[in-house]
Swiss-Prot record:
Minor component of the type IV-like pili. EpdA is not essential for piliation to occur, although its presence has a positive impact. Keywords: Fimbrium, Secreted. It comes from Methanococcus maripaludis (strain DSM 14266 / JCM 13030 / NBRC 101832 / S2 / LL). This is Minor structural pilin EpdA. Contains an amino terminal motif QXSXEXXXL, which is part of a class III signal sequence.
Amino acid sequence: MFKRFNRGQISFEFSIIVLSILLISTITITYFLTSSFDEGTRTLDKIDLGAKTAVSLVNSGYNGTQTEGTLIYAGMTWDNAGNNYENITVYISNTTPVPVNTRLFVKNYTIESQGIDTTKYDFTIAWSG
């Protein structure tokens, strides 16, 4: 009779220990990730992701934004000034001229979809091709 109770008790204690280890691991990883990347780094990542998505949407003809050629996301550069990121430039290569409304769509989509604070992080798009 006591052996059954002991097995159940050990199983319960083991479950509590595993749960505690998982909880501590999750808290540690979350703390590490939030303290490792500052706001500027996260904003650069958002601009990068937003621009890539906007280029992909234009290439698929999203919302009437069509070009005769293909847009290619070519990368991004920036300057560090202390803890600030300045002169952020996104490079997009195009094979044919891109209409003004499509250019505006790419920039506005990047800003709006990623919630970029343009008073702190303004960026330009350099079109080549």
